């Protein structure tokens, strides 16, 4: 949707969507769409500055929080309120990981049954799988289904789940 020329809004809302848009573009566009007294609300995940060295991706996502805070100053947006809810949302990752672990048990059972009943088909499947999916991706998938790396502790370590209420210094 392209707003009509000169159309402004009381609120520009980014809920679980901000991390998918270049931050500078999103904030400048939102600021330009605000009417006098309008606000921007951002509720999303931001990266901490903690370095990550595992072959697995960090749980969570988003723009670095340090860059977001700098950008807010550069674009001249005021922080009306800022709330971190990381510890409140983190337990959902433990539930998600347990689900994947249950899926892993199911895959094991099916695989064992197929190896017993169709060994040559499973060898062929394994060969095709290893040809199509590179080792790094296979390792990540294995760790995702059987491991416990994507958990609440790692989410808290590598992320800040923030709610920002922002306003512009617009004087129109």
Predicted regions, residues:
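A short glycine-rich, Lys/Arg-flanked "PGG" loop and its adjoining helix->strand segment in the class I
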Residues: 24-39
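A short SAM/SAH-binding and catalytic strip from SAM-dependent methyltransferases
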Residues: 10-24
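Conserved beta-strand signature within the Rossmann-like core of class I S-adenosyl-L-methionine
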Residues: 37-45, 49
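A short acidic, Gly/Pro-enriched loop at the edge of an enzyme's catalytic core
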Residues: 2-12
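Short, catalytically relevant binding-site loops at active-site mouths
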Residues: 19, 46-50, 87-89
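Short Gly/Pro-enriched turn/cap motifs at secondary-structure boundaries
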Residues: 152-156
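Short hydrophobic/aromatic beta-strand or adjacent loop that forms the aromatic wall/cage
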Residues: 157-165
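Substrate-binding/catalytic lobe of Class I Rossmann-like enzymes that use SAM or dcSAM, i.e.
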Residues: 55-151
């Amino acid at each position: 949707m392209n707003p009509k020329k000169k159309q402004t809004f009381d609120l520009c809302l980014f809920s679980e969507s901000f991390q998918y848009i270049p931050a500078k573009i999103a904030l400048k566009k939102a600021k330009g769409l605000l009417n006098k007294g309008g606000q921007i609300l951002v509720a999303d995940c931001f990266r901490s500055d903690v370095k990550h060295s595992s072959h697995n991706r960090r749980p969570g996502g988003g723009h670095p929080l340090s860059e977001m805070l700098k950008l807010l100053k550069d674009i001249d947006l005021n922080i009306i309120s800022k709330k971190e809810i990381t510890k409140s949302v983190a337990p959902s990752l433990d539930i998600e990981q347990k689900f994947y672990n249950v899926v892993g048990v199911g895959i094991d059972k099916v695989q064992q049954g197929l190896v017993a009943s169709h060994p040559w088909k499973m060898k062929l499947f394994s060969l095709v799988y290893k040809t199509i999916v590179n080792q790094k991706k296979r390792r990540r998938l294995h760790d995702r289904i059987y491991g416990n790396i994507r958990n609440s502790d790692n989410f808290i370590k590598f992320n800040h789940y923030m709610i920002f209420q922002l306003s512009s210094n617009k004087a129109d």
